[in-house]
């Protein structure tokens, strides 16, 4: 079957139904159109070809008034959600055209309208959405250098807005929320941000909308109307002009695609990025907070360790808390105290977890109820969840801490809604809403009467069957039913001669005949009339119950949030007691003191093996920077990540893996750990490293924690050492930065900075030598390492013996003693005393003009070459000198 393009079809030649299909399709050109025909949603032309391929459906054809049949495929209406979700997850948008009237009662063409457009960011089907993760739609507006960012999860009702003023902060927000769909104005689309890269990294659909979505007046109006306020100041948007446009554009997009009142979007949360600890994309990735670097999975992350939640709502809230650590000491202490109180009341906590466990996803249930897509089983799940609330509320009353008391007060048992569901809905209803069997007996008088007529009708049929058997002598006479012929008598051919004259033939089969009578017709009208009326009435009654629940959306969402936070606190309490965590003291003096700290994830992954704990001490004075040396594989990276994770956990409000901990509030954590080429962006390992270092040096503050691992290793030894050295000098200077820093390096020459730069201290990983072999003790000790043990590590890794032996020979010849001696000289003389052109001390430099490297004059290099005593230089000296001169020239050319 050849592909027929809808744009090229002669409309006048088409059938009326197909003409309407194409008119509807024209209104939604970027969507696949699901067009309801009876019990199926059908697709035609190129949509059919696309869907049949994507969903592996049979492609057929339909007469459409043209010589060539229209390509067609379809899916059953009762199973549409699964097919919809599969298409949307592949990045398609789907418009659903529903029958708006009963085809039996329609005069002419059945009326059909698009009732909803389903997109990746507007999915509400809980069977498809990941329970523990939000499904976000994000709107971005770029106006006059300001990015307005609004994020919404229509499945839960979460709705947020903020503003950022640079591209890096914007990308951090995007990756933090990881939306499945992103809509934007044309200015953002053309701003130079690599949208193709964003699509790939997020696996998201990105669309630039028409300008009408971003009209200042219309965005403000739609927000005022939705939230029933006269001024946007009431929403906290007084100082968020661009943010308001983003929030309004998102709302208008939802109105147009969902064709729904969106009554479950009850509040707009306005936030600033400064309300929480800043974690850039690199830090989130390197610390593996919610997803591992390689496998992209939850197992092996901090979230995996902390997540002992019992509800989907709690799991999502915990993820949010991990990604947004607090910087408010008061709020941290409230969480800590709640966890401590739960720890001290073990039995009550276990009871709490027991009652939390059966609770369904209230946030997404009320979302579907508000959307009017919830089915009878959703209401039963909702009612069963409400049954747990009084018990949870009673347990929370036992606690005296501020946060737990607030949660108890916010938890509404919703007894009236529980009673409504118990009275109205049968305990095991069908999943569909239009086939009856939903409403309980005794709930509605007319429904009971129709149900009784339906039940009695079956008795009447049985009596009629028996009566006609006796009257006719047809022993196997039976009353049967099907949807085409209704009720009928079936008589086999062997008794055909006994059929009386008042039997009216309806159908002839191979082995039997089917008949009706006036009395059977009369009973059929009564019974089927009662059934049809009952099914219709039950649907109306179900909708009334659903509407009544939807009208209480504010109460339900408030309770859902209270349940989610209760679940999170219980989870953190379980983790604290199970893994022997301690309550950290939170200080505002900038001190980080950890006694016997442990890496929360590595400790759990090790199973029965003992984790070697380590101490950490950093402050804003004499202990700002720890230079950490030692061989690869010894545990430097684990130790540094451990310190960052303990700090982050403390600011979540969690207990931490240590014997003692005193954590100074950090405004940001930056990490530069590991190296990987960013091939998608065409950036090398070293370029990625330098970009991240530049970001850290430009955006860190004295209250930040920096985790820097092997800075400078992606280039030549001399360049790398120079960069690492300059970075330490820059960070150590309190007039410039003065941030608390863990700096791991294989450049032992950097240990010379201790005693010459304020706040720098040397630490190393203890190693025990046994002949040519080494044992990693995993212990951080004071002082610098005197060897890198690279050959021993290579031996442990299984490098062939001849290579190891040759390496031992070469290491004696290629000793870096000259480099070390020169480094010591530079350190003793201080920054800027080198024999080449003087480099100013960091505090003498205009920060706006400062660069890591200074440039050299070509005449200086020529003079240096002329003064060389070549005849007295060893081959190694000559090579070292040539390398230095080459590096200087490269640096000069880079700055031309």
Regions found by a protein language model. Name each.
Residues 371, 375, 385-388, 402, ...:
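Charged, surface-exposed helical/loop "interaction arms" that form contiguous linear patches used
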Residues 426, 509, 513-547:
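Extended, charged coiled-coil "arm/hinge" scaffolds of SMC/Rad50-like chromosome-maintenance ATPases
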Residues 8-341, 357, 361-370, 374-466, ...:
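Charged catalytic and DNA/RNA-contacting regions of genome-maintenance
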Residues 97, 120-129, 261, 397-403, ...:
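Active-site phosphate-binding and catalytic loops of NTP-dependent enzymes
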Residues 1-7:
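Single conserved hydrophobic/aromatic residue that forms the stacking wall/gate
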Residues 45-48, 240, 310, 321, ...:
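ATPase nucleotide-binding head domains, primarily ABC-like/P-loop NTPase cores
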């Amino acid at each position: 079957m050849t592909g027929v393009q809808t744009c090229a079809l002669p409309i006048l030649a088409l059938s009326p139904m197909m003409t309407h299909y194409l008119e509807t399709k024209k209104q939604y050109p970027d969507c696949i159109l699901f067009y309801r025909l009876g019990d199926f949603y059908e697709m035609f032309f190129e949509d059919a070809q696309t869907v049949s391929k994507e969903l592996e459906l049979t492609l057929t054809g339909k007469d459409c008034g043209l010589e060539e049949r229209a390509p067609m495929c379809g899916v059953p209406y009762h199973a549409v959600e699964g097919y919809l979700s599969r298409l949307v997850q592949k990045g398609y948008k789907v418009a659903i055209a529903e029958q708006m009237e009963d085809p039996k009662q329609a005069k002419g063409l059945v009326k059909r309208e698009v009732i909803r457009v389903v997109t990746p960011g507007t999915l509400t089907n809980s069977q498809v959405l990941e329970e523990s993760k939000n499904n976000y739609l994000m709107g971005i507006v770029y106006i006059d250098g300001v990015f307005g960012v609004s994020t919404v999860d229509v499945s839960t009702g979460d709705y947020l807005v903020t503003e950022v003023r640079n591209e890096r902060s914007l990308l951090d927000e995007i990756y933090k929320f990881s939306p499945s769909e992103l809509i934007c104005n044309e200015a953002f689309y053309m701003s130079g941000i690599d949208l193709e890269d964003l699509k790939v990294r997020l696996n998201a659909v990105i669309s630039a909308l028409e300008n009408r979505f971003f009209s200042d007046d219309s965005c403000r109006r739609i927000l005022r109307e939705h939230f029933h306020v006269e001024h946007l100041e009431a929403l906290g948007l007084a100082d968020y002009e661009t943010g308001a446009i983003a929030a309004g554009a998102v709302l208008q997009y939802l109105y147009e695609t969902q064709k729904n009142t969106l009554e479950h979007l009850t509040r707009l949360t306005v936030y600033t990025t400064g309300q929480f600890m800043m974690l850039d994309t690199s830090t989130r990735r390197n610390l593996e907070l919610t997803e591992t670097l390689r496998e992209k999975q939850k197992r092996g992350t901090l979230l995996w360790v902390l997540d002992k939640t019992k509800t989907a709502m709690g799991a999502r809230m915990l993820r949010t808390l991990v990604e947004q650590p607090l910087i408010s000491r008061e709020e941290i202490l409230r969480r800590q105290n709640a966890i401590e109180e739960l720890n001290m009341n073990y039995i009550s906590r276990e009871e709490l977890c027991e009652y939390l466990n059966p609770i369904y996803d209230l946030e997404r249930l009320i979302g579907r109820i508000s959307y009017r897509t919830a089915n009878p089983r959703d209401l039963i799940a909702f009612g069963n969840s409400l049954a747990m609330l009084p018990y949870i509320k009673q347990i929370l009353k036992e606690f005296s801490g501020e946060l737990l008391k607030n949660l108890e007060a916010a938890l509404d048992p919703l007894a009236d809604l529980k009673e409504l569901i118990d009275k109205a809905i049968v305990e095991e209803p069908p999943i569909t809403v239009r086939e009856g069997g939903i409403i309980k007996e005794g709930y509605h008088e007319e429904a009971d009467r129709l149900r009784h007529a339906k039940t009695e009708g079956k008795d009447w049929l049985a009596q009629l069957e028996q009566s006609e058997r006796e009257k006719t002598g047809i022993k196997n006479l039976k009353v049967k039913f099907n949807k085409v012929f209704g009720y009928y008598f079936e008589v086999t051919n062997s008794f055909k001669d006994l059929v009386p004259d008042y039997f009216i033939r309806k159908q002839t089969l191979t082995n039997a005949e089917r008949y009706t009578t006036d009395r059977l017709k009369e009973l059929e009208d009564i019974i089927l009339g009662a059934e049809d009326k009952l099914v219709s009435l039950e649907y109306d009654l179900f909708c009334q119950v659903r509407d009544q629940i939807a009208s209480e959306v504010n109460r339900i969402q408030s309770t859902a949030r209270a349940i989610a936070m209760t679940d999170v606190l219980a989870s953190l309490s379980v983790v604290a007691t199970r893994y022997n965590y301690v309550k950290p003291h939170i200080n505002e003096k900038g001190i980080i003191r950890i006694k016997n700290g442990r890496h929360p994830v590595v400790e759990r992954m090790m199973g029965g093996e003992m984790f070697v704990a380590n101490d950490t001490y950093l402050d804003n004075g004499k202990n700002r920077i720890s230079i950490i040396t030692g061989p690869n594989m010894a545990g430097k990276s684990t130790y540094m990540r451990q310190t960052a994770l303990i700090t982050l956990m403390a600011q979540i409000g969690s207990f931490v893996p240590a014997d003692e901990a005193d954590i100074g509030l950090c405004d940001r954590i930056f990490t530069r750990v590991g190296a990987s080429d960013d091939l998608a962006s065409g950036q090398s390992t070293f370029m990625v490293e330098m970009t991240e270092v530049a970001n850290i040096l430009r955006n860190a503050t004295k209250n930040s924690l920096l985790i820097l691992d092997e800075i400078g290793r992606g280039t030549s030894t001399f360049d790398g050492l120079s960069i690492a050295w300059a970075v330490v000098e820059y960070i150590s200077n309190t007039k410039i930065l003065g941030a608390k820093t863990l700096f791991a390096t294989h450049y032992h020459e950097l240990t010379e900075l201790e005693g010459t730069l304020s706040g720098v201290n040397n630490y190393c990983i203890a190693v025990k030598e046994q002949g040519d072999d080494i044992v990693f003790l995993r212990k951080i000790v004071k002082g610098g390492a005197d060897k890198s043990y690279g050959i021993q590590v290579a031996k442990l890794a299984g490098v062939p013996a001849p290579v190891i032996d040759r390496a031992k020979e070469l290491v004696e010849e290629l000793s870096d003693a000259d480099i070390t001696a020169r480094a010591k000289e530079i350190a003793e003389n201080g920054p800027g005393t080198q024999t080449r052109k003087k480099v100013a001390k960091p505090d003498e430099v205009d920060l706006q003009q400062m660069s890591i490297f200074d440039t050299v004059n070509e005449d200086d290099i020529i003079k240096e070459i002329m003064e060389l005593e070549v005849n007295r230089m060893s081959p190694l000296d000559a090579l070292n000198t040539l390398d230095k001169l080459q590096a200087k020239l490269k640096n000069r050319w880079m700055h031309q």
